């Protein structure tokens, strides 16, 4: 069932070892966690909108998300401190590999005009962040039952020390990159 976990253990570790020649097996980069964040700006006007976002993120990730609160009040956005403004979920271990597999095999091919990810999305420490504009690219979301199309930010946190190691690791999982 967890093909990506087996792929990492059987092929990707071996390829990383050949390319970067690590002295210790604990130096080999791995994916630590995947964080999915969904900001809901409309929640300032209607507090029920956040529940729909939580339901969508639960279906996508298979895990109940945490509702995020505003840290401080901002009058121009009509935002008060401790107001619900989004939700996030952190995936680790088997759920992380399951989500990554569904993302690469099912969701990304359904994104319109998707050419791949830019290498500029790495943060310099081996972590990779990108955004999706629609939650409907995941088959778990029923288009007829959603109230509005929402995007999400996805961060893949790795133990890689450099972006080059992280790029090689994520390319092993068939994440499409360009340039």
Curated annotation (Swiss-Prot):
<dbReference type="GO" id="GO:0006412">
    <property type="term" value="P:translation"/>
</dbReference>
<dbReference type="GO" id="GO:0003735">
    <property type="term" value="F:structural constituent of ribosome"/>
</dbReference>
<keyword id="KW-0694">RNA-binding</keyword>
<dbReference type="GO" id="GO:0000049">
    <property type="term" value="F:tRNA binding"/>
</dbReference>
<protein>
    <recommendedName>
        <fullName>Large ribosomal subunit protein uL5</fullName>
    </recommendedName>
</protein>
<keyword id="KW-0699">rRNA-binding</keyword>
<dbReference type="InterPro" id="IPR020930">
    <property type="entry name" value="Ribosomal_uL5_bac-type"/>
</dbReference>
<dbReference type="Pfam" id="PF00281">
    <property type="entry name" value="Ribosomal_L5"/>
</dbReference>
<keyword id="KW-0687">Ribonucleoprotein</keyword>
<dbReference type="InterPro" id="IPR031309">
    <property type="entry name" value="Ribosomal_uL5_C"/>
</dbReference>
<comment type="subunit">
    <text>Part of the 50S ribosomal subunit; part of the 5S rRNA/L5/L18/L25 subcomplex. Contacts the 5S rRNA and the P site tRNA. Forms a bridge to the 30S subunit in the 70S ribosome.</text>
</comment>
<keyword id="KW-0689">Ribosomal protein</keyword>
<comment type="function">
    <text>This is one of the proteins that bind and probably mediate the attachment of the 5S RNA into the large ribosomal subunit, where it forms part of the central protuberance. In the 70S ribosome it contacts protein S13 of the 30S subunit (bridge B1b), connecting the 2 subunits; this bridge is implicated in subunit movement. Contacts the P site tRNA; the 5S rRNA and some of its associated proteins might help stabilize positioning of ribosome-bound tRNAs.</text>
</comment>
<dbReference type="GO" id="GO:1990904">
    <property type="term" value="C:ribonucleoprotein complex"/>
</dbReference>
<dbReference type="InterPro" id="IPR022803">
    <property type="entry name" value="Ribosomal_uL5_dom_sf"/>
</dbReference>
<dbReference type="InterPro" id="IPR031310">
    <property type="entry name" value="Ribosomal_uL5_N"/>
</dbReference>
<keyword id="KW-0820">tRNA-binding</keyword>
<dbReference type="InterPro" id="IPR020929">
    <property type="entry name" value="Ribosomal_uL5_CS"/>
</dbReference>
<dbReference type="GO" id="GO:0005840">
    <property type="term" value="C:ribosome"/>
</dbReference>
<comment type="similarity">
    <text>Belongs to the universal ribosomal protein uL5 family.</text>
</comment>
<dbReference type="Pfam" id="PF00673">
    <property type="entry name" value="Ribosomal_L5_C"/>
</dbReference>
<dbReference type="InterPro" id="IPR002132">
    <property type="entry name" value="Ribosomal_uL5"/>
</dbReference>
<dbReference type="GO" id="GO:0019843">
    <property type="term" value="F:rRNA binding"/>
</dbReference>
